[in-house]
């Protein structure tokens, strides 16, 4: 992979976190993501699902800051993202899954439903909507949501989303 391709892939991942587009990742981006999801799915912030989503967003931010905010200014710059989030997590993808899981679980609950075992599941269409409201382009959201439905039953389980998100942010590979 040439450096231009690598830079482009990193830029996409950075932009996915930088929800307000001000060129750094901070707590406000995670809160913005939570707010967008709640609005899209008509869920109030002041309910169990809404609170779980904000709690998950805060945990995700704290985890991201712990890994990538090298200078401790409560902002993750592009340089910090590349050096910390991408390089360090590449060696430990399980760590990313761990910090992202509470947010993803809560997001899927907002978009879908909670199973009796506490895990969450959503339809392919709902996951596509969630990805679009978080800034993914239409075709990207559609392709990504479709590929998450590995058994083709029209629904996507929490574990599949966590694994896919962890892989997306920790494994930067050339296009096939
Ligand atoms: Ca931002
Ligand atoms: Ca920083």
Where are these regions (language model features)?
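Solvent-exposed, charged amphipathic helical/linker segments at domain boundaries
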Residues: 90-98
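Well-ordered, non-transmembrane segments within structured domains
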Residues: 81, 85, 97-104
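The feature marks the first
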Residues: 1-50
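Amphipathic regulatory helices of Ca2+-sensor modules
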Residues: 25-45, 76-91, 121-135, 157-171
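Short helix-capping and inter-helix turn/linker motifs at the boundaries of alpha-helical repeat units
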Residues: 1-5, 55-56, 98-99, 134-136
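Primarily EF-hand calcium-binding motifs
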Residues: 7-22, 51-73, 101-119, 140-158
